[in-house]
Structures are given as C-alpha cells and as structure tokens.
Amino acid sequence: MLRYILRKMISKKWLFIALLIGNILLTGIAASNPLYADAVMQRMLTDDMDAYLTKKNAYPGLVSVFFNGSVKKNGLIKENEALAHAVPADFGVPARMEVRRYFMSPIQNQPLIERDDAKISSIGLGALEDVAAHARIVAGRMFDGERRADGTVEVIVSQRALVELNLLMGERREFPKLTDADGQPIVIEVVGVYDVSDVEDPYWVRSPSSYKSECLLDFDLFNRLFVREDLPVALSGCWYELLDAEQMSARNAQALYETALKYQEMGKNRQYLTVTVAFSDILKNHISQARRVRVTLW
C-alpha cells in the first residue's frame, strides 16, 4: 500500500505539491484568524469611542464619582474619595487624568461695602484641583494659595458667575454663618475671571459656565479650611477619573463592562453616592456586535 501511494505521489507530484501548499496556507489562515479577529474587534471599539467623543463632545473614558453630602455626612467625603482613587486599578486601565472637585451648598453672604445695585444672593464656594494649570484668566489674576494676613480668601469666578451673582472685581463678601476652625467668619475677594485655556482639554468635564453660582479658591486651601466634620454647611465632592480609552482592550470588553456595572450598582446601593460610567453603553453594544462579527469571521 505504501509503495502504491509513493508511486501515485511520484506520478502526480505537482498535484500533491499543490495540495501540500494549500494545506500550509489553510493552516496559516486558521492560525492567524484569531489575531485578525482581535484586530477587527479593537478597531470597532476604538471607532465606537471616537463616535461618542464626536457626538457628545465628551471624553468617553470618564468615570464620575459624586458624593452629595449633608452636614451630618461631611466626614464621609474622604472615604468616598478613596473609592474614586481605586477606579483605574479596578478597571485595569490607567487614568489620563484625575480631576478632584470639592464644593459646598450656596451660603448667605453680605458685601463688606454696600452697593445700591447689590444683589444679595447665596454663593457657593468650591475648588478644582490644578485649575490654575488649565484655566485662562480673562480679567484680573489667579488667586493666591494662602489666606491674606487679614484672613481674606482670594477667589476667581467664571464670566457667567460674575453676571449671575452680580459680583464686581475686587469685591469682598463675608459669610457670617461660615467660619474657619477658629470661629472667624470667612471673607472672600474676587480677584479674577477665568475661562478654559484649551477647548479640547478633557480636564473641563464641566464648562466654566456651569459654575454659575460658585466661586473657586485654591484646592489645598479649601481642604485646610473646609474639609472637616464640624463644617456647618453641607460639603460635597466629585471625582472625575478620565481613564485612557486608547488602552481599553476589546479582549477585556466583558470584564470592563462587568466592572462598570459593579460601580453603577454601588452608586445605587450607597446613600449620597452616584457613579456614572460614560463608556458602559459603549461596551454593552460592542459586546453584542462582537458576537455577530466573530460568527461572520469564522
């Protein structure tokens, strides 16, 4: 039998060579198909992320952790900050940037120099970490990171806040019910008006105009003055974790989606906490599409 097969192979050697080459090519295609499929899946996920950015003008890798505080819950803000810090490690994706924001409920205040046109409205005080590196001062100057010798705290406002709150450059306002640790009323002075320095900067999850009722002061100074349990005003925090969307692997789409669901469920089960994962629906749709595409490729 073996001799018969050998004679056939010799007599029809070109046919057998063609079959051998065909088998080699078929094996190569079968071996490379998973790599090709992975590349297609990754391209699909990247395109979906780009489409989200174009359609919503918002960064697709964003995870927002929002703590809506109350006077009795002010001491929990650091606990929730630790939860936000764990987001990149839990998703297994490095963060391009983390933006920390602290703010308090609007508070009654009064101008130190009376104005005929003064509108006495409640004003919120807040802080954005590293805002000086991402903002452009359009009038006045950036705040100082320390209190003045007389206790005054320097703040900046958005152009909309300047109008909505009827504030003036150089104006000083006192907050009788908001005191420092020594019991002294907080006094602020508006020293600058800010806007974005780069419209494509992902740092500005919220545009300056959205801070229409809030004055911003130095982040570290805000921490020293107001991040304490005995603060007589509700203290809230928001942490924006901007995960690197380009490093999200399509191979891990299912695991990423399950982690997103875990965080969203955490926000539902914890009082005062809200968690939003911008790319959750992107991953959900990608997983569904990927199943159909893989069937086609195979």
What role is predicted for each listed range?
Residues 2-298:
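Membrane transport/envelope proteins' first extracytoplasmic loop
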